[in-house]
């Protein structure tokens, strides 16, 4: 019996002019940036650059693709984005693989024979439709473990295949190495491997194929565009996070059209208009440690300050490739419910609407700009786009010294790093130190914005990726 074909989703990404960065970059950097695109367009000669991942929304990979592909298209590159289809069993397994690659076994086991069968069957179901869309000679960028099993078929089809890993750990344990051993055979035929940090590169990969490209943010996206104080408040009122009438809750969409916030967040309680906010934005993911943030705030910040905590994440059923989220959210709500009322009322769990991705981005933007301190107390982190987003908005950030966060924050200059993310007292003391010292908060925020300006904006990422693709099609 033939394997049924998957329904591949093609994303509408539009185009954006690279010229908007001309005033951000110096003359020399702008020339190098624009020349890289010109060279690639010449070398591609009508071939397409494809990006393949497993979800259209709700995570850092989807955000990167949505914001960066339009620049390639605006520069004359035919770059596209498609999303594979998978069953609940597939996403249960790939979530497990994700945590194994961070050194954590959620169910205490390695990869089973049945899980491998589900994975390979899903890859087979998606291969046929992809080969009907993608031509020999095209370049295909496959993102994360969910797509690793597609490498061989696409390479045999005559494509230049890049496998892009957005996750990793600084010090791999045996669980991580076992996950590498399971995935490595799928990747042999890739033309290149891209990691976010040198420390994340796997053992036994062909070194000549390995490249390191750190992620970035785009300051012109809906999530990062400038918002004045009135717009911030209007957006947060329209989403029911702050009390009061909606006002003009407008924002600029990714395609340049005007948008308006119309949907409310699902909240445990509303935030007072004058509250000082400690904010973490993330998926409902155990590796982001929202439970640790909640407990650290309740035990060490709330009793010694007037601050409120907002834990913000996506509407719990909106992210297809992360089936653990409902259970983690329920656990958070149980922890909050058990707290004494005076502390409980200052902790807000907010599920943000996801039906309109630009609307969601506008709400996150407003929350980050409204926050007094932004935290990211991850137990593991590939890069941590929410850190760079808050830094760009000149917010003081308190975050774990893990993964790509350590690359972004210079401790004491552009944020504060917590050496042990499980040390709730140190976390609380760091947050209190910022809340209690306005000059320190301002200085850290200014240093944070400058750090992102110099190291983590889109042109650097786009130039490095464009040069890699150019080298493969020369």
Feature names for model-found ranges:
Residues 1-474:
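Catalytic cores of nucleotide-sugar-dependent glycosyltransferases that transfer UDP/GDP/TDP-activated
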